[in-house]
Amino acid sequence: MTMEINNTDPFEKMPLPDDSGLSGSGAFDDSKLAKLNGVISQGLNPYPYKFEKDEDICEILEKFEDFEKNEGLTVRTAGRLYNIRKHGKMIFADLGDQAGRVQVLVRKGNLPDEEFEIFKNLVDSGDIIGVQGDLFRTKRGENSISVSEFSLLSKSLCALPEKFHGLKDVETRYRKRYLDLIVNAEKREIFVMRSKLISEIRRFLTDREFLEFETPILQTVYGGANARPFTTFHNCLGQNLFLRIAPELYLKRLVVGGYEKVFEICKNFRNEDIDTTHNPEFTMIEVYEAYRDYNDMMDLTESLVSELVFKLTGSYEVQMGEKTINLRSPWKRISMEDALKEYAGLDIFAHSIEDLKKIAIENRIEDYEKAKSHGEFLALLFEGLVEDKLIDPTFIYDFPVENSPLAKNHREKAGFVERFELFLNGWELANGYSELNDPLEQEKRFEEQDKKRKLGDLEAQTVDYDFINALGYGLPPTGGMGLGIDRLTMILSGLESIKEVILFPQMKRED
């Protein structure tokens, strides 16, 4: 059978934005274009292939710590030029790479006259150059490199923001993150922190003999969380596919297959609202361990997060605005039912459903009309009345079964499941279960979810019969946990917007 391939250009019917001033030569500075032509007319390549960079700037700065020994030492490095200051026969500038900045001095007499004139007239702030020169200190004590050789490595054609005004517009920083990183060193540090965070998560788990796996991003059946998916179409297979909303069901298949400690650091995609703590494309880690339950997963989560915070910041305390949050163990653990009593003064089971509706209306809690049971009202009122009060790290455990289709029934409390969520700064940071491993119960839960979906609940889960079949071969008792890396980076950096910790957050097109 021959499958018809859809070769339609996906952009063919999409209105294209007005790119005037944003792309091509229209975005480039006229004076920089003229200088580019000047460089070429000198027979120089403004974009050479390679430069032997012997030292990072941070290593050069370390040499100044023993200046008596290293004065006059010849160094060779490269970076981007900032803040060029011309003083007749002397030109000062700052040279920066990913690790630091150092002042450079280009002096007539240290370079051939022709090269000095090229630097003076054709090199700009924003250009990337390589330099060789000797370490010295100015009369004002400024650590500097006296340049004896330079190479233009990349001629910039776009002007950097002014020194004193910088790049302040938040939306521009998000849309042009590359420019944000060029001019705002403190923003670069956020993503250095994020990179180290992910490395430390891997180290923590691999030290405990967990294995890292990769599971599909494109899936025929989406699941593992209650969320709306992104849909696409596979031309060759002739079928719809969904972008992953969670890796959970595939990772549990791996535990069925015999791997007892697994994790994945992954991108997930949820077609939902965008706000200060939600982005449709986000990063998380999911961890599963056989022969463990949700108590063990709380222990693992607490150890992981508290160790990460201390390793990356040198302290167990983080600052969120005016709030100081202490992540030193032990953390508070309280059931959802008791948390509602403690923080909102509400005993959920002492009220009728009609009473709970009135309470929801009085507190302007949305979607109360969807709640039909005490369990559903417990989850709804907890979210509306308690979550934002959980500033210090707090595990909320024992959730109602109605909104937890993948968690194991509670061993003692009917109507509840063994599930927890970690809250910090009023945000959900992690979610974990004693994993449901009864295939018949899982099928029943999925079918209940599917009924909700068909009645209009677009976040309800679908039935994954292959996953049910996998459970039929036997999933050992298993504990699982998912942790949001974006929000954890926000906590470590003291930031209140998720867009500040995602390099290229989703933004509405500028049509």
From Swiss-Prot:
Mg(2+) 1 binds at E421, E428. Keywords: Aminoacyl-tRNA synthetase, ATP-binding, Cytoplasm, Ligase, Magnesium, Metal-binding, Nucleotide-binding, Protein biosynthesis. Residues 1-22 are annotated as: Disordered. Its EC number is 6.1.1.6. Its cofactor is Mg(2+). Binds 3 Mg(2+) ions per subunit. Disulfide bonds: none annotated. Mg(2+) 2 binds at E428. CDD domains: LysRS_core, LysRS_N. One of its GO terms (molecular function) is tRNA binding. It is an enzyme of class 6 (ligase). It is found in: Cytoplasm. One of its GO terms (cellular component) is cytosol. InterPro entries: Aa-tRNA-synt_II (IPR004364), aa-tRNA-synth_II (IPR006195), aa-tRNA-synth_II/BPL/LPL (IPR045864), Lys-tRNA-ligase_II (IPR002313), Lys-tRNA-ligase_II_N (IPR044136), Lys-tRNA-synth_II_C (IPR018149), NA-bd_OB-fold (IPR012340), NA-bd_OB_tRNA (IPR004365). It catalyses: tRNA(Lys) + L-lysine + ATP = L-lysyl-tRNA(Lys) + AMP + diphosphate. One of its GO terms (biological process) is lysyl-tRNA aminoacylation. Homodimer. Belongs to the class-II aminoacyl-tRNA synthetase family. PANTHER family: LYSINE--TRNA LIGASE, CHLOROPLASTIC_MITOCHONDRIAL (PTHR42918:SF15), LYSYL-TRNA SYNTHETASE (PTHR42918). This is Lysine--tRNA ligase 2.
